[in-house]
Amino acid sequence: MPHFDCLIVGGGHAGAQAAILLRQLKFEGTVGLISGETEYPYERPPLSKDYLAGEKIFDRILLRPRNFWGDQGIELFLGERVKALQPAEHSLTTASGAEFTYGKLIWAGGGVARRLSCPGGTAKGLFTVRTRADVDAVMAVLPQAERFAIVGGGYIGLEAAAVLSKLGKQVTLIEALDRVLARVAGPELSAFFEDEHRAHGVDVRLACGVEAIEADEQDRATGVRLADGTIIPTDAVIVGIGIVPETGPLLLAGASGGNGVDVDEYCLTSLPDVYAIGDCAAHENRFAEGRRVRVESVQNANDQARTAVQHIIGTPAPYDAVPWFWSNQYDLRLQTVGLAVAHDERVVRGDPATRSFSVVYLRQGHVVALDCVNRTKDYVQGRALVVDGTRVDRDRLADADTPLKELTAAQG
């Protein structure tokens, strides 16, 4: 039975970064990493962008060269999924029957793409965009498929729509809510991206629930039936409706949690010597008014990896990183800092018609987040306003010619 001083579950950004940091910070114990995927750790953001577009080959999105892991004394177990955890024994079992013991365990299981639960939801020709295998499957049908229906108007759906539109495909994007990005951004940003996608030929359908997937005699998807009975003919369907956190073994072993596994400020779960980081970790975040949230981003994965590793090596520092995120669509670069979940006011800097503007989110007059489209200077300078929760003068904030670094606290 292999034993590791630190065993990591998950080969995504969080798990890989934890392994990298253990060695960078001179952890001398044994390190193992178990991943359900058969691939060496790789970047996920390019999957719905450059990789899907065929602009980057897989080797260019590897997080490290293949020989790095062995050279660093990090043992990889690829294609293995953890089935059960025995916290009292500090051991776990994989689906193949392999058993491991550990001193410390870092759970970076991430999540699996959420599937449609409607009739026809298991038909052939339905795809997700979560793993390399997912995107390879989409790319395999590109030569034959001309009509794509994308279910979900979040970032994954919008990025996939942009790539497919640029490839000359006929794209219909279906969103259940009344605007895209409704869960993460204000209506100004939603309207801007809706207009952009329509200008590029995407048929954007809002407030449309999916009733069923139509399929032929071979159980291959031929259309998406909406709640009002409308059928969108399609050759392929991409489902981008979020993820389900991969935390089953932890919760079954008694860890606290629900939508994710609960962690404290050092990324420790309620189980002894077990940490959780990345997409699956529900933590209290001061940028969300102290609410317990899961943040699905590379930033969160990397920063929580550092928090867990520093605690393991005896230099603890509580997690307090400012959230940030980016999205590329067409020739647009969106950069986000902070969390807009609890804002009560928005100020727009610049004119969206120029395709260069920012939306600043306030709570009781204090800056809590920014969405910046083709406006990197606002993103860079606005970060400090978010970190400090700066109270700003709204008139100066709305003046696009006033650098954010010059804003001073409003009086009164």
From Swiss-Prot:
InterPro entries: FAD-oxidoreductase/Apoptosis, FAD/NAD-bd_sf, FAD/NAD-binding_dom, FAD/NAD-linked_Rdtase_dimer_sf, Reductase_C. The keyword Phosphoprotein does not apply. Its cofactor is FAD. Disulfide bonds: none annotated. It holds the Pfam family Pyr_redox_2. Its EC number is 1.14.13.-. Binds 1 FAD per monomer. It is an enzyme of class 1 (oxidoreductase). Optimum temperature is 25-30 degrees Celsius. One of its GO terms (molecular function) is monooxygenase activity. One of its GO terms (cellular component) is cytoplasm. Involved in the catabolism of 5,5'-dehydrodivanillate (DDVA), an intermediate in the biodegradation of lignin. Part of a three-component monooxygenase that catalyzes the O-demethylation of DDVA, leading to the formation of 2,2',3-trihydroxy-3'-methoxy-5,5'-dicarboxybiphenyl (OH-DDVA). LigXd probably transfers the electrons from NADH to LigXc. Monomer. The three-component monooxygenase is composed of an oxygenase (LigXa), a ferredoxin (LigXc) and a ferredoxin reductase (LigXd). This is 5,5'-dehydrodivanillate O-demethylase ferredoxin reductase subunit.
